[in-house]
């Protein structure tokens, strides 16, 4: 079969010496499988994109294939007819390949008659553009229908080729073997323009029909049009390939119009972003990590003070700006680039606290494989569209040392430690760099803890978070600011954004006061709003500096509180049949109960929000502190409302009424016990040191606040209130100390080497000698002491956790106090056991000290913890036996301590007289588990106030059986 090929070169004279040479960059592309092959073509006919510097004799390819080559010179300068030598001169080709069917015998078309009846068919297209690489191709696949069908033109408009480095333009048309039935093919190229070039050669038309072929029917003409294709990217070679594949049946009209296809260089797109001076990023600071890899190696960041000769990857030039001061990747809508590292949208790369936008949008040039897509030399395939870079899930990841993971299909960038994308985005959304400002380092970390709790994330420690901050906002400096003795580290050059909610949170911290109804039930876990004029004359500075207030970080500490606990109901006020004071009516009694209930609920709310300083404000508000100070400012609206509900005169009268005093005492015990359980729900659970310190500072100031707020209130009410508040403060101090000891001992109990050393030292202790010395005071049975000794050693050897040790101690208390359960002597028996436990443990520590045991420090810490925890257990057992709260039990001892004067010399004589009347007391006591110990009398276990040195009696003796 005959195949005709026409070569038209507008630049050089024809030479018929050599066959066409395929360049090294020829792209072999077999015809589509759907095209039927004639008998003469046994193998698929490859297509070659050739560079024709001089015309050669035409070789006849098999089948009815036509090849049209049109060369458009970029300048009128004549070209050399010699064989092309390797040169950097770039060329641009437009290659059109048309697969058509055989021509009928009745439809012969001569070679000289380029005009024929055209039948245009649908053309599914795909364009892949590579910028600044080796080539840029425009691939258009046209499906030629077997039968003449509807018209589906292809129009590619406004593609211009600049003059830069494009001396010649070739138009190559290849027509492979025809199918069974097809039409004539006509190629029309209109206005192939050159930008800034010599006179245009347009239009260039190559409407060449196929020649006569024996036994082959003629075909109708299929016309493809290319109109004014503009290209504004400086490239080495630009090629357009139009390939037509036959289809079996004619389809409906399919029209695809691509106008204004302009590949944009990265510099031209990102140039609109502002430029910020930042250190360079060198290639040794960037690693390429395959997608899906979870481990990233980190190396030291290079110092910005030393000038490295290595060329930086990203340079700050006027035409290329990769940095943005405080923006995000979302601010750049659809930037186009040829070097993408992921296929799932924009990839922010954080350098010096600003993202480098390196993204490719699929909506700019196409969205599917059947549409026009922007490709690139970043790894995108010729069949993938839209992503440009590596298509699919094989996206890589760039890691800046000490920074974040960039890219990957999941669009995640994580710190080399444990930073989540939400944390990085949170930092960028809430903080910004600025000159002349600073932010406390502790405040920033507290904000981070708040963020972690909201996002259900595991926070890192302060040191790791500091590295995270410096990686996001590079170049930060640290300064120690503040007065002498109260200075703190600050990040200099960092501030909270004006749009950040953290700024409003800090403002609320600086203006802590109640707004509106101070006694109404406030919603839990909400920051208390500020009010105009700080209440009760307490300045903002005094509230924020005098006490460690962590109200701004309330939410990250909520996990350590039991905020779900509500205030129990108070009992009704029992008048006990007494007559109301003069001037007080039943309405005043009811108003006092309602107001006091609201007052206690408000205290619970501020405590749950860790706004400890507001407790003093609430006390002053309820007890009308301002109304008793004539020199103070006019009373606030809240005082006016409270005055309407319960006048201050009636409040003073009720403060002397005994039933009101008893009811107030009961309410305070219930309130303070609930507050203890809210603040410290588990004494062994780790609590942040900041929260512990805030609680201790609050306990230290509690009594002075109350005394100051209740000025001019009757002394009877003041004593009741101070006793309960003192017990509450003492409980908070003890529980925080116990918690601190528990965390210190936890580390010891988890250290295998220390446990082994403690066992070795404990085995050297002469427990027989210890028992002999302690029995004179404790009078404990030998078998009980031996059992406790063995249990202690076994538990220590098993390396049990702190919680297991606590369970063992609780079991010891239960076994020892079991015989006294339900008896009236249970409280004194429990106190006696606590004294014996403490004394016996001190004897063991004494022996370890004398032997210079290596583990003395560990034993001392363990002993302190166990003694304190025993105190905690006994306190709760006694309160349970009495049916009261632990706060109420401790309040009784507080009242007893204030009523006794240990320095009174007259009491010594009375105590000496009492010693002489105690000879009839029995001799022995044994608090053994399961023993036949009788119940203790109410007064039998009272120790003598003074014991003679020569008296051989035990300090504690057993009481006679009660009848």
Curated annotation (Swiss-Prot):
Record-annotated membrane-spanning stretches: none
Could you tell me which residues carry Phosphoserine? Answer: 54, 962-963
Residue ranges of region Disordered?
1-88, 105-126, 174-218, 361-392, 899-948
| Compartments (UniProt record) | Nucleus
Top-level taxonomic group: Eukaryota
Classification via InterPro entries: DNA-bd_RFX, RFX-like, RFX1_trans_act, WH-like_DNA-bd_sf, WH_DNA-bd_sf
What spans are recorded as compositionally biased (Pro residues)? 20-41, 75-87
| Pfam families recorded | BCD_RFX, RFX1_trans_act, RFX_DNA_binding
- Compositionally biased, Acidic residues: which spans? 906-922
Per UniProt, the keywords (alphabetical) are: Activator, DNA-binding, Nucleus, Phosphoprotein, Transcription, Transcription regulation
**Residue stretches of biased makeup (Low complexity):** 42-67, 361-372, 932-947
Composition bias, Gly residues: 373-392
GO MF annotation list: DNA binding; DNA-binding transcription factor activity; sequence-specific double-stranded DNA binding
Q: Which Gene Ontology cellular-component terms appear in the entry?
A: nucleoplasm; nucleus
List the PROSITE patterns: RFX_DBD (PS51526)
Instruction: Return the Polar residues bias intervals.
Output: 107-119, 181-196, 204-214
Please give the DNA-binding region boundaries.
423-498
PANTHER family membership: MHC CLASS II REGULATORY FACTOR RFX1, RFX TRANSCRIPTION FACTOR FAMILY
What is annotated about its quaternary structure and interactions? Homodimer; binds DNA as a homodimer. Heterodimer; heterodimerizes with RFX2 and RFX3.
Outline what the protein does. Answer: Regulatory factor essential for MHC class II genes expression. Binds to the X boxes of MHC class II genes.
Protein family: Belongs to the RFX family.
Q: What is this protein called?
A: MHC class II regulatory factor RFX1
The species this protein was found in:
Mus musculus
Q: Which gene encodes it?
A: Rfx1
